[in-house]
Structure formats: C-alpha cells, structure tokens
Amino acid sequence: MRALKRQETRFETAPLRSFYQGKRVLVTGAAGSVGSALCLQLAELGCAQLAMLDQFDHGLLEILEQVHRANPRLDALDALCDVRDRERLQAWMNQIAPDVVIHAAALKHVHLGERHPVECVLTNLVGVRNT
C-alpha cells in the first residue's frame, strides 16, 4: 500500500495477526492519512471488531466503506467524535470497550500548528490525555 507516498516496506505479518486476532481495536484519527492506512491494515489482521473514531464525518464514511470492501465480514463501526471532548470520548470508550487503542488523531502540519497553537495543543496534547 502506498497511502503515505513512501516506499513500501515488507514485513512478516504473522506476529501482528497473532496479536490482533479476536481483539476489539479502536483507532482514533481514523479518517486521517496515518489512521486510515492503519485501519486498512487492521482490516486484514483478524481483529474481531474495528472501531474507527474521527471528527471528520466525510472521511470517516470513506474509510468505513474502504474497510467494508477490504473485509466485508469484519465488524467495523464508525464513531463520530472529537478526541478533545473527554466526556464523549469516554462514552465511546465505554461503549466499544476496546482491547487495543491506537491513537492516530493529530494536527500534524507544523505551519498550521504555528498559526493555530491553541487548536494544536487541544488536539495533540489534550487529545492524547483524553485517549
């Protein structure tokens, strides 16, 4: 997969399959470039459920459809939520009860972070604490 526009690296997936087999996995930032690539990889690794959380509704629908195409039997669900909203995030965590959380939600563009430092801190620092 070339989702990140970098040279693809091949690696042994058996240990990953063994780890994720039968687990409920939650990915925050699922609609982003890193989060969506992770979701597509997780769809192939045998997890019991893949919950994809993001505040970007259109992107969340897109990755949900892509995951369904990649693995129609996977119990995949969308969670529309902002990681900065602690109460809503906790409600989703309680509902999903994940075995594994992969936190990929972030504002990653440095120039935007410099122009919007409050938003960057709220998402990148408070979001991590909330997760």
List PLM regions with ranges:
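Generic anion/oxyanion-binding catalytic loop in active/binding sites
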Residues: 78, 109, 117
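N-terminal Rossmann/SDR dinucleotide-binding element
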Residues: 1-97
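Conserved NAD(P)H cofactor-binding loop of Rossmann-fold oxidoreductase domains
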Residues: 104-108
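Glycine/Thr-rich phosphate-binding loops of Rossmann-like dinucleotide-binding domains
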Residues: 35, 110-111
